[in-house]
């Protein structure tokens, strides 16, 4: 009798184990293969910094960004801020941002063609002093109220942290002054957080190389190539962007004190 019970239990165990194994094999889905998406764009930017005295300045950025080369409108950025000079090599800025995003599919009736965002932001820029080259560090925090392109979608709060390190190397002069041609490099990392952020905490990585020229003490132009790497709509999809950037930097100082200390923080 005991042998009979043992046989029954072994049979039930084998049947149950086989059922579980079969169910697991049927429910298992292999992870999707990594997908790479290539895109191109052209970004234009105007950066302004207007000093009212030794400590306070207005800061502004105005960007027009196009996708698919130059073909389609992508974004319009309007960034405003107030800058306080902490020291010769350090600036603190706070302000607001009002960007607008154009939907990639402008013909989809279920999507809004243009969607706004609302942000507040804080930034610390400081320089590492060297004799000839210039090295800058930028720490930027953003609180973003953003929504999708779907009609009627609600705004959600996310947070973003950005760190950028920038290097300027003069080419035709020993130091930076009027009519200096220089190399410009930077690397910037974007990290985001929030309830709606699930897999793409590392939002973007941007690498830039270009040339710049100091037209005068108040005006500078830069042009170069930027490579961007980021998630694109799904955990296994990655977008590689090749972007041409053309930027104009305008600086004015309304403070008339001729004995003020020379500032070493550029427009960023």
Predicted segments, located by residue:
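Solvent-exposed loop/turn segments connecting transmembrane beta-strands
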Residues: 33-41, 66-75, 195-202, 233-240
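Residues that define the transmembrane beta-barrel architecture of outer-membrane proteins
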Residues: 38-42, 74-76, 116-120, 155-163, ...
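Residues on the lipid-exposed face of transmembrane beta-strands in outer-membrane beta-barrel proteins
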Residues: 46-50, 80-84, 122-128, 163-171, ...
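Short loop/turn motifs that connect adjacent beta-strands in outer-membrane beta-barrel proteins
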Residues: 54-55, 89, 129-135, 171-181, ...
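Transmembrane beta-strands of outer-membrane beta-barrel proteins
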Residues: 58-60, 92-94, 135-139, 161, ...
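Transmembrane beta-strands of outer-membrane beta-barrel pores
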Residues: 62-68, 96-102, 128-130, 141-145, ...
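Outer-membrane beta-barrel "beta-signal"
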Residues: 124, 240-268
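Outer-membrane beta-barrel transmembrane domain signature
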Residues: 140-222, 228-229
């Amino acid at each position: 009798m005991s042998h009979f019970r043992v046989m029954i239990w072994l049979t039930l165990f084998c049947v149950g184990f086989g059922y579980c194994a079969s169910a697991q094999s049927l429910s298992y889905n292999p992870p999707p293969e990594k997908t790479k998406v290539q895109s191109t764009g052209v970004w234009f930017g105007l950066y302004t910094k207007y000093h009212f005295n030794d400590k306070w300045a207005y800061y502004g950025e105005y960007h027009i960004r196009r996708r698919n080369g130059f073909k389609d409108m992508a974004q319009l950025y309007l960034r405003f801020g107030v800058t306080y000079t902490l020291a010769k090599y350090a600036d603190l800025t706070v302000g607001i941002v009002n960007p607008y995003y154009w939907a990639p599919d402008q013909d989809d009736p279920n999507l809004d063609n243009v969607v706004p965002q609302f942000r507040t932001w804080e930034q610390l820029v400081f320089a590492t002093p060297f004799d000839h080259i210039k090295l800058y560090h930028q720490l930027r925090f953003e609180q973003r109220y953003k929504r999708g392109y779907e009609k009627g979608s609600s705004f959600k709060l996310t947070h973003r942290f950005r760190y950028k390190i920038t290097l300027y190397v003069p080419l035709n002069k020993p130091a930076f002054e009027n009519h200096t041609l220089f190399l410009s490099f930077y690397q910037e990392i974007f990290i985001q957080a929030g309830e709606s952020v699930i897999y793409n905490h590392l939002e973007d990585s941007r690498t830039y190389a270009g040339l710049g020229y100091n037209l005068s003490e108040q005006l500078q132009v830069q042009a170069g190539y930027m490579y961007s790497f980021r998630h694109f709509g799904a955990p296994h999809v990655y977008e590689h962007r090749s972007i041409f950037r053309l930027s104009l930097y305008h600086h004015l100082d309304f403070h008339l004190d001729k004995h003020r200390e020379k500032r070493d923080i550029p427009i960023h």
